[in-house]
């Protein structure tokens, strides 16, 4: 199973290792699933991870190291160009573009996200919520 993980799933999984997103990250760590990301997702994660610094005591250098490790473990693709009217929230276009690029290269089966705007596109694209993914694949 190869999946694109949205930034919100990565952040939740890192913040709460026993949560459903945390269980997905654990499956990735154990090699049960492969993850596809883009530099956009990695950069966004690098921007939002400082929110966890109070909870987990991460320094800026540790955050950089963590994101670099995730980049090494993931398949990194360049997001495909997506028309602005494809998504209600234009900020989600690079995430959708990451999924499309991965699908075009046969590198991913679906996008796992908690973003409601992206989930609304699930009839046109293989997009699942964290709960749907975990239920479907017994995670």
Question: What are the roles of these predicted feature ranges?
Answer:
Residues 1-37:
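Short, well-structured N-terminal submotif of metal-dependent ribonuclease cores
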Residues 7, 39-40, 114-116:
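Short secondary-structure boundary segments
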Residues 11, 42-43, 118, 134:
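Alpha-helix N-cap/helix-start and coil->helix boundary motif
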Residues 14-15, 49, 122-125:
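Short, flexible helix/strand-to-coil boundary loops that buttress conserved ligand/catalytic motifs
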Residues 19, 36, 61, 86-93:
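Residues at secondary-structure transition points
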Residues 27-82:
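PIN-domain endoribonuclease scaffold, especially VapC-family toxins
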Residues 71-110:
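Active-site neighborhoods of divalent-metal-dependent phosphate/nucleic-acid chemistry enzymes
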Residues 105-112, 116-139:
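Acidic, PIN/NYN-like endoribonuclease modules and their adjacent C-terminal/linker elements
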């Amino acid at each position: 199973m190869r999946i694109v993980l949205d930034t919100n799933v990565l952040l939740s999984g890192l913040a709460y290792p026993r949560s459903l997103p945390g269980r997905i990250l654990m499956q990735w760590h154990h090699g049960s699933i492969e993850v596809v990301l883009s530099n956009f997702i990695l950069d966004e994660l690098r921007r939002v991870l400082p929110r966890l610094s109070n909870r987990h005591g991460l320094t800026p250098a540790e955050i950089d190291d963590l994101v670099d490790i995730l980049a090494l473990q993931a398949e990194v693709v360049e997001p495909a160009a997506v028309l602005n009217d494809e998504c209600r929230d234009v900020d989600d276009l690079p995430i959708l573009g990451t999924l499309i690029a991965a699908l075009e290269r046969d590198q991913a089966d679906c996008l796992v996200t908690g973003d409601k705007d992206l989930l609304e596109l699930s009839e046109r694209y293989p997009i699942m919520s964290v709960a749907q993914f975990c239920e479907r694949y017994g995670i």
